[in-house]
């Protein structure tokens, strides 16, 4: 996700014939926005509902993806780390549910949101360095909207 958004902002800057410094800034803005977006997506995988997500809660874990909230919890909770290491695709659903509930009840969700916010802040700082105009205000608006994303 981060790479896709990064490439999009970079290619947009190149095709609009921006100078090298603006291309570099827009590339980094895309990277930071993409990282923030992906982390929020990882958080929503635990905090949202199946109806809102359009997929089962915890589907990243069910599919074997170790996301930031999981990594953060593994780092501070050895029992949880062991549970994750023992999970297999054919593990019983209740084993996955246990891990999902541990994440939901932990502060790893808030920690991941804080990391996402840091990336968003870096993007906003770089956006503030861009020349004033309609493209800048659109990018600023989009970035702020991403920070309040809940689906």
Residue ranges: model-predicted function:
Residues 1-151:
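All-alpha prenyltransferase/terpene-synthase fold signal
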